[in-house]
Amino acid sequence: MELPKLLISLFLFSFSSFFLGAESDYPQHSNLKRLRPNRLFVFGDSYADTGNIRKSLSDSWKIPYGITFPQKPSGRFSDGRVATDFLARYLGIKSPIPYTWKDYAGKERLLYGMNYAYGGTGVFKTKDNPLPNMTTQIDYFQRVLAAGNIYSPSDLPSSLALVSVAGNDYATFLALKRPLTELPAFMKQVVDQIAVNAMRIHKLGVNKIVIPSMQPLGCLPSITVFNSFQRCNATDNASTNLHNYLLHKAIARLNNETKPSTFVVLDHYNAFLTVFKNKGPEPGVSRFGNPLKPCCVGVNSSYDCSNVDEKGEKKYIICEDPKAAFFWDIFHPSEEGWRSVYSVLHKHLKAIWI
C-alpha cells in the first residue's frame, strides 16, 4: 500500500457504535468441503503484489527491498515475503506467478495460480497512478481464462482468490481534498465495489474468495512517526473499523445470496493488533520490541526507503535486523511481520477451510 504522507490527517470521525455485532453478521456454512485449494489467484495492491509493476516504476525493485528474500529486489513491497506468499505457504503451494511474468514461466509453475495485484492501486483509480485498478485486474484474469491455454473450467472450483484492499482509495480521497463529511458515503462505495469484484470473480468460477479486513491504518509508521512510533492513532483506527464493519455486512449479504459458495473476511485488523500487543510466548508470533517503528526509513522526511541522491548515495537507514521489526517501511510489514500475522490467522484459516 502506497499511501501519501498526507494520510497523517486521515479521519476525523469515530464510528465505534457501528461496529458492534459485525462478526455476528458473517454466516457460517456447515456444508463446506474441508479441502484446501490447490491454486491461488490474487487481486489488489502492494500488500499482495509479488512483482507485477515494471522495474522502472517502483521502489519495490530497488535495493534494499528484498534484502531478506530473495536477497535482492523482487518487486515485493517488503524486505521479503508478503501476504500472498504466506497464504500460498498455508495452502501448501508455490506463490503464484505475477501476471506480467506469465510468458516467462513454465506451464507447471502457472498451475499454482496467478497474481494480478499491483502496488499502489485500489478498487477505483488512484491518484497519479496509471496502473490497473481491481476491475482491470479482473479483466486480465478473465482474458487468461478465455484464452483456455493455461486454466480449464475444471481448475477453478478448487481455486482460491485473495482480494486485497489496504487503503489506497482512501489516500486518493484525501489527496483530492474531498470534504471529510463525504468520507462515510465514499467508504460504502469502496466496499460495495469490493463486493461487486468478489462476486464477479466467483461468477468466473472461483468458489472461495478471501477478502482481508483493512489493517489498523492508525498504526502505520506514516502515522505514528508523529508520536515517535509510540502509539496508534485511535481516531484513524475507528474509521478503519467503519470500513471493516461495512465489509462484514457486504460479505454477509454475498454469502446469503450465493450458497454454497463462501466469501470470507480474513481478519487482518485484529491479527495486526494481536502481534502488536504480544508480550509473551504466543506460538509462532514474534515479540517485537517496538512494533510500530519501521526498519527502513529515509534520512529525513524528504526521503523514503530505497532513495538515493544524484550521486547515488543512500538516503535511507536500515535497522540492524529486519527480523526484529514488524514494519519494513512506513507503510508495509516486514517478512517477519507478515509471518507473525499469518501465524495468528492460522487458526482462523483452519476453521474456515474449505
UniProtKB/Swiss-Prot annotation:
Cellular location(s): Secreted
Sorted UniProt keywords: Glycoprotein, Hydrolase, Lipid degradation, Lipid metabolism, Secreted, Signal
Family: Belongs to the 'GDSL' lipolytic enzyme family.
Superkingdom, taxonomy of origin: Eukaryota
EC number, UniProt record: 3.1.1.-
Active site: S46 (nucleophile), D329, H332
Record-level GO cellular component terms: extracellular region
Top EC class, one word: hydrolase
CDD domains: SGNH_plant_lipase_like
Name assigned to this protein: GDSL esterase/lipase At3g09930
Gene Ontology MF: a single term: hydrolase activity, acting on ester bonds
Pfam families assigned to the protein according to its UniProt record, in alphabetical order: Lipase_GDSL (PF00657)
Tagged with keyword Transcription: no
